[in-house]
Amino acid sequence: SETLTVMPRVINTANNYIAIGENIHATRALRRDGKRVETLADGTEGVPFKDIQGESHLLNVPEHFKKTQPYEQGQIKHFMVAIWKGVHGNADDQEQGAKYVVQEAHRQEKAGARFLDLNVDEVSYDLAEQKRAMQWLVKTVQKVATVPLSIDSSNSEIIAEGLAAYDNVAGPPLLNSVALERVDALDLVERYNSHVMLTAASADGMPEDAEERLENVGRLIEETMKRGIEPDRVYIDPLAFPISVSKEYG
């Protein structure tokens, strides 16, 4: 019978821990009145940043973004802005969007990320637009990445688009993620020889307790073994929560 390689019960060195950088998401937001957002004398609003060469820039907020609900509620979804510029902007916008994304990828690598997670789900409600955004993001980040990419989405079609665009130069990608509600996503793991994140979610929602988590993950591990997916390509997200959420997590 096949045995699984597992992480130690006690993580006491950096070598026992695998960090996935999850900042390059269209969901990420900054407060408009926060210290990272700047308004120039001419009224231009944006996020100051330095590219990987150390040159200063301002990721300015396009006018149409100012009509969105997050902006009106005091937030700037800065990676959404960068991705929009990269996909739809003029030449200057495209360069600015790419530099913003690249500097964040570089920053996360320096901090020890072993995978760079990319998610574009909130870019649009339109699937074709989401796929286009994922293609652009993967191709932009992989030009500079020295660690593999993690392709993250709630939609398997978007994940497939990202995996297809990835060149594998930095190593096999990570599919983030597979749960009981979409076991068929493991087909993509086989097709692209990727790593995979298995989550402890139930087929119809969040698990109630540790026993249900173990049961859910066990069923998923069985599916990976049926497909011949090597244990060292499999990672587990137990969906752990702080005790402040519920006493069940204590």
Model-derived regions, located:
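Domain-level signal for soluble alpha/beta catalytic cores
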Residues: 1-238, 243-250
